[in-house]
Structure formats: C-alpha cells, structure tokens
C-alpha cells in the first residue's frame, strides 16, 4: 500500500508539472504571442514598451540567445548552430538580454526563448569561431566553451529513413552534431543553461527539434528546471511554459502525442490547412468545425500559427507576407476563432531560403525603422504592426472566455460568426460581394470595423456598422475591397 501511495503521489506530481508547463503565464486578459524573428534585444525592449504592451500583446518569442557559429553571408539559420551557451549573439549580449527581459516583464510582456537542446553546430572546416569569440572544432565534436567532447554526442549517422525512430532521434539532423540527452552530464549542462535564462526572468521556451529527442529525456530535463523567478512578477511555484517543435503530418513514427503531455506542441497541420483554405483550395464553410475535428491537438495543447520562420520559406500551401490579402484574412480568422495558443509572425523580407536579416556593411543586424503609419520600411516586414493584425490581437483580448455562436456561411467562401455577445467576424473569399444582414450578437449601437480603420477619439477612421436592437447589422465586404474581412467588438463601439 505504501509503494502504491508513493507511485500515485509521483504520478500526480508529474501530471501537475505537465499541466503547469502548458500555462503561458500571461498577464490579465492578454493572449497572443509574437515572434520577433532576429530582432536585437534592445529593439525588442523598446517594442515591448512602446507598441506591444499598448496594443495588448501577451508575449514575445525571441531568436536563440546562445553563442552560434559564424557562417558566410550570415544566413538566419546560423542562429540554430550553437557553439556554446554564452549569451552573446548578433541580437546582443547577456546584459542587453537581461535588460530586455526585465523591461518587457515590467510592462506585462512575457519572453519565450527559442532553445536548442538537440544539437550543436554542424561540420566546419578547421576551427570555427562563434559570436562570442569562442573556438570549437565541430568536425571533432569539440566544443570547449561548454565544454562538450565526442563522448557527449551520439555516434555520427545520417537520417535516411524518417520512419526509423533510431535515426530520427539519434542521427544528425542536417549534419548537426547530435547531443546525447540521456547522459547525466549533457542533461546537467542543458538544465544549467535553461535555469540561467529562468533566473534572468524568461517565462518559457520554444524547444527546437523536439521530435529528434526522446520524450523521456525531455521529461527529465523539464522536470528538473527551476520555478519561474518571482522577482519578475511570476507567482510562487510557477513553471516555465514549454512549447515544442514537433512536425507531425500524421502517421509519423515519432508523433506529437509523445510530447503533448510535457507541454504545448506546434500544430503544423493548423498552418497547412489554414493556408489551403484561404488560398481557395478548401471552402471556408468547412471551417465551422475548425480544431480537433480536423485532427488537430486539443486547444490547450496546440501552439497555433499561420506561418513560422521555417515554413514561410517553403513552397506550398503555407501563407506568408507575400500574399498579404489572404494572409490578413487567415490571421484574422486565426485570432477570432476560439482554438489554440496563438502566435503571430514578424518577419524580415527574403528572396531565398538563406536571406539574412537586415544588416549593415559590417554584418551587424540593423534596427527596424518605421514610416508615419508605424509600418517597418528598411527590410523588416513587421506583420505584427499591420493594423489588420494588431487590431485582431485587441479583438482576441476583447472576446476572451466567450464561445463561438451564430455561424453563417453562403455554402462556399463567405462566413461569419460571433464570439458570445462581445465580437463578430465576417470574411469574404469569393469573387463577388458579401452584402447581407447578419447577426452580430452585439448590443445595439454603432461599431468601428477594426480591420479597415481604428477608433480614435470616439470616431472611426474606417467602415462602421450599425447594429439594431436584435443584434443584426448590414455587412458589406466587396470582392475588390482592400481587405476581405470585417471585425467588430465591444471595445470598438463608437
């Protein structure tokens, strides 16, 4: 009986930890993360204070913080090839990182770090030098900045069969030296690295290449981490939010279900299917059952996105900033529909897969610059600063804890729905106008469409909709309108 009680206690403790690791630790009613891809720490700090907090964002996913290899031309993916766990990259040093985390936490914006636990850098001719000046010999699996040596890695092999669990989890992903996370020493170095970031005030981690590590090894590492730092406003005993990159299109040998008990999982099927729908390859009417009926993870386990820094560079169904009208419609639906833990992308312009972030002649990352409307102009795309996207972050905050109701569609690509009595969204992806009296579910009054304009000093700069005492309003979205979506909510009442 004593043994049974002990086993039950340990089981319940593990379950409690895993549930805690699904909690993003957001402030108040905020509930959207933005990935400020390749931004400098000083620029993120200022963005938290001047833009993200006032617009109601909840958190920022930042690029990898640890020292990385220096590759010719400085492609973005060099950040995913670690040399050491020193906090020096082209985004800044440890002091600048700590200052950014503190300043963002002070205004209610949580920081989530993209962490690389699976591997170190790939082969390099001779001695490689990292962004902190540390030398390493990747071909010999020698990384004195940690230190790691050959005994800390799995034997070298190539992934040739993605249906072979051994290859997927113990061979080298695109030639990157594969760490042995079952080693007590390797575990201790990874835990030390993550705990240092927790001490500096981060709220959690995006775990890169999680499916290439055994779930039981990650469970040990996550369970050994410190609680979040109460000096940064986290409650006592709060656990870091974990969201894990697991690409699973179905029927995979290593599946997302092995990881979703440990934390949230990136729901790549969401990204692919929302792209299919808004590219016109699947009628929007089918989105009424969006979520688990589509084979997605449960809402609290799914990190959802229209695109991410990887798949936006691939050809296929995934939408990106280069198809702005469809992208804004898809993002509006993403943030309006009650499913998933939402993340929006903030990109830089790219012409090919390897395009580096905007940089000067000395290969220093440059700060984003803004026009009079607040949009980025110097190589940064900054989708999160598009009115149609940040306004939907406000919409998502306004309708939090409400359910979907009053779904309407025309049997094709025109849809609308309510979020309780607090919000209404309509989308037209047909080649003809949507002109219809629809139930908005809102209290009577005049509302500003936050897609086409903003509510400023009590006046709407875009379209407005008058809602009658029965909750109905006349909705018009022309097929040639600049945006194919309209959104109303209680905080945008004129």
From Swiss-Prot:
What InterPro entries does its record include? Answer: A-amylase/branching_C, A-amylase_C, Alpha_amylase, Glyco_hydro_13_cat_dom, Glyco_hydro_b, Glycoside_hydrolase_SF
Gene Ontology cellular-component terms listed? extracellular region
* Residues annotated as the enzyme's active site: 208, 245
Q: Where is this site: Transition state stabilizer?
A: 310
Q: Which UniProt keywords apply?
A: Calcium, Carbohydrate metabolism, Chloride, Disulfide bond, Glycosidase, Hydrolase, Metal-binding, Pyrrolidone carboxylic acid, Secreted, Signal
Localization, per the record, is: Secreted
Cofactor: how bound: Binds 1 Ca(2+) ion per subunit. Binds 1 Cl(-) ion per subunit.
Instruction: List the signal peptide residues.
Output: 1-20
Cofactor(s) named in the record = Ca(2+); chloride
Q: Pyrrolidone carboxylic acid occurs at which residues?
A: 21
Q: Name one GO molecular function term.
A: metal ion binding
Grouped into one coarse class, the protein's main location is secreted
Task: Cite the EC number.
Answer: 3.2.1.1
The UniProt entry's sequence similarity note says: Belongs to the glycosyl hydrolase 13 family.
What is said about its interaction partners and assembly? Answer: Monomer.
- Any idea what this protein is called? Alpha-amylase-related protein
